[in-house]
């Protein structure tokens, strides 16, 4: 199964009054100065493939100069199918559509997944744990509707339980029902996270070794529930996590009431990168950290293809300027030639003549 993004059109969106972009099945390079709207087009592609944006905009922020309605349309083609994805934003509200029929964000996910790589991602290793959890969950939500449901349900449970904990009249007896709900959702989410991270970890290890020969990198999951049991049966693991989370919630109840926040569960877990057995967050050089992130993105591409049976749409937003020549070349080699890719740049000098010959280059604004 192979799907491609064929045609993107926007109206009253961000910096554009109107714009249409025909995409190559291989590489499309959007070249132009800063503020030409290149990143806005990357965001539009991400919105209609993942149902979300790395900018987390309000509906009003999508509308060009406040004059709506904002409309974004993306045509997907492949295997004899044509699918039209859409998004509209007006009066502070936004809605998605699929073949003209209104749908939720989930309705545009999973058809053609997308993998975004932008400069903000380069700090993923050294930033807080929430950044790495979000990277894993955002990717998982594209691959599985069940994953998306679990992440959403668990997030609501945490928010509502935290609201209860902040009340001055909250006591242990009131937490029982909430503890059961959050433990059920949390244990199921944990199992899904571990399965996805296990898929990603092997590709991260391989890709890192190919870029930085002689060094070994790994990525592991550290749970607030303690050491995870080495079991292959997912139901057995979920049962263990449920019981352990109930016990941990009870153990920390007094402190949680005092602090007004839930202290254990997947929302507090850590995803740890290591290089040569040492914490990458603490000891890795900037170059090593960037190679880890590069390897993570290569892994996302590989896992998306494995799980969904179609190569994802790769979105590279001005990231080439942040990588040195060796890492730029290594990244593009690891991705391969059969991945539909959209790249933004202010400088075509970052690319080889061979890539420029194969790519469709779209000039936006002044020639660069």
Task: Set out the residue ranges of the language-model regions.
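Conserved lysine of the Walker
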Residues: 38
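Long, charged N-terminal accessory/stalk domains
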Residues: 123-124, 130-176, 180, 188
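Glycine-centered positions in the ABC transporter ATPase nucleotide-binding domain
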Residues: 100, 365-367
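Hydrophobic/aromatic beta-strand patches that form the interior of the parallel beta-sheet core
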Residues: 115, 342, 360-362
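Conserved NTPase motor "head" modules and their coupling/switch loops across ABC/AAA+ ATPases, GTPases
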Residues: 1-33, 47, 174-184, 188-313, ...
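Nucleotide-state sensing region of NTPase/ATPase domains
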Residues: 46-131, 135-147, 201-206, 241, ...
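Walker B catalytic acidic pair
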Residues: 317-319
